Amino acid sequence: MRKIKIILLFIFIVSAFFSFSNAYATTNFNVPRKAMKIYDKLDLNSIVQSDNNSYTFTTSNPDVVSIIENVAIANKFGQATITVSDENSTDTISISSGYYVGIDVSVWNGDVDWPRVKAQGIDFAMIRSSYGWYDEYDAAAGKEYNFQYDKKLQRNVKGAIDNDIQFGIYHYSYADTIAEAEMEAEYVISAINSLGDEYINKMSLPVTYDVEHVTTLSKKELTDIVVTFCTKITEAGYKPMIYANTDFFINKLELSRLTSMLYDLWYAWPTSNPNFNNKMAIRGTDVVPIMWQYSWEGDIAGAQTSGGELDMDVLYMKDRVKVEVYNLDTLIDFYGVNKGETLDIELPQLEKEGYIFEGYLDQEDNLVDSSTIYNEDTRLDAKFSKIKITSIIPVNTQLEIDSVYTKYISFDILPKEASLVDETISYEVADKTILDVESNTGKILPRKDGKTTVTCVLDSDNSIKATVFVNVHLGYVKGDLDRNNLVDANDASIALEIFKSESQTQEDLKYGDMDDNGIIDANDASLILEVYKINK
């Protein structure tokens, strides 16, 4: 009795443990934010961590980001929140469709914790390189701009690169003359060169001229300074960009002149309620910058200043074109490509796939232990109780061919899964009451016992096709009561026992009803014995 009590106590503890574990199983996203290019797809399962096999996804804005079979699809520019839920927990992720989210940092942000920044979904960073310029005569003029590289430049660039965060450079300007603008350009180029080629070659965003220093210059004079700087940067092999707020872009610069020269613009317009579903234009104009500084109070931990401040930005992705691929009138798939760029779609090639046979007689009655047949019609003279045939179709679905009631087996080889096979190969089923094929996966959907053909057709050229004959048997070989794929003495023994104990066949034992009268009886046992004698 004591032993029984101990066992019961152990069972109770184990059950309680698993109940407790299940009650506190959680599902969450591995990042809080994710950027998607418009018309791209994202497998949501790939960014989920879960202790629970059962969870669902919902989207706050299906017009922007829709969800089909756990795949997020970016439909247009905007922001959407996707929620994952299981019976115990929920979590959310912010999807930015058509734009990246980033920060801009300098020495004032201290030692930025770049791994922590990356973990919070930051895609890019604008890093201050320097301010002013170096001139040995500045001291005499009362200016103190010597050696003004940002002291955290090297550290910040390395941190961004090490954490796969794209980055660019910005330089704070004090220039009041063309000559000073030239010196500032030379100064920022020297700061960039100090990084070394290993870092420079990984800089993917522009070199920015930060224009916000108070000035009494005219629009033309200040614009001349900006153009001078940008020209020097271009000549050095970098792409220039101009940072300014509304006052500077509208009242202190010739905006139309800058846009006509196709310079990238970075617009400072912080707001407490940013709208991410429309691109931000410079106030009072229809000019859309490529980058928008939307906040000075970012909440990205590990990058804030000592006062808790952090500049937040969005970088608009290039305009996208949707390319749709059709088979006649049916949309097969779609792709996104940057406007003005080309899209290469690799057409599939039908490739050979084999059938592996074990233990059959060839047409000269020679016993063959094992072989593989490729891309040809094949007829095998087989002893049905010995042959084992497994066919491999696209997506590695396995079908067991039932050979019990035929001596000769003929079939064509189904093509091997190739590039884009789901999008470019159609399946034709002769008798869909027996089986169907999922058009997008190539998986067989069996419906009832029977034999039919599946023809695989290359959509781009309907003359390229291959056919497989498929036998579907949802249960087991008739008479194979012990389910070892052979009808043998053990099956006969089982059949006799069933006959002695039961006159009516149980539903799950009907594969032993060899004469199809709905009852397992002496006749079935006799037939099983005959099959066994033939094949032992």
Positions of predicted regions on the chain:
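Cellulosome-associated attachment modules in secreted, modular CAZymes
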Residues: 18-23, 467-536
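Extracellular/periplasmic catalytic domains that process cell-envelope and extracellular macromolecules
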Residues: 96-97, 118-121, 161-163, 198-203, ...
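Secondary-structure capping and domain/repeat boundary segments
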Residues: 27, 34, 320-386, 403, ...
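Functionally critical loop-and-helix segments that line ligand-binding/catalytic clefts
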Residues: 98-109, 259-320
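Substrate-binding cleft of extracellular glycoside hydrolase catalytic domains
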Residues: 99-230, 234-236
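Sec-dependent N-terminal signal peptides of Gram-positive bacterial secreted proteins and lipoproteins
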Residues: 4-24
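Extracytoplasmic soluble-region selector
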Residues: 24-98, 385-480, 489, 532
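Catalytic domains of cell-wall/extracellular-matrix polysaccharide-remodeling enzymes
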Residues: 199-280
